[in-house]
Amino acid sequence: MEKNTTSSCIFCDIVQGSITSYKIGENEHAIAFLDAFPVADGHTLVIPKKHAVDFSSTDQKELQAVSLLAKQIALKLKMTLKPSGLNYVSNEGAIAGQVVFHFHLHIVPKYETGKGFGYNVNKTNKRSLEENYQLISESKN
């Protein structure tokens, strides 16, 4: 496991075991634990063990590990807590709501009570689908 690239990453501290967490799953490159500030029962975070600031900067190996572990956790949550559905959420950048700058995937169970994750759509002047398609498809990435 590569060393934390920031001096004060709480998720790196959890990976290293210097901060206690409610770990509910793990594989070679990822770990899953209950969110300390849950928005619903069973709200879980799945993170790569190797520090990466966000989704876009996370290596493929770690992304695959996070994805596979997220699926295992989702099945555990469905079997044990019986939610009506699940939200999978990752915020990238402060403006998008990212608070901890170590890539993490939220798995938020949804129950009939309506509690849990939700979002509001902001109405803006949007480019047409055709304009967005042209911009994105011409990118070399």
Curated annotation (Swiss-Prot):
Residues 10-117 form the HIT domain. GO terms for biological process: nucleotide metabolic process. GO terms for molecular function: catalytic activity. A motif (Histidine triad motif) lies at residues 102-106. It comes from the Bacteria. PANTHER family: ADENOSINE 5'-MONOPHOSPHORAMIDASE HNT1, HIT FAMILY PROTEIN 1. This is Uncharacterized HIT-like protein MG132.
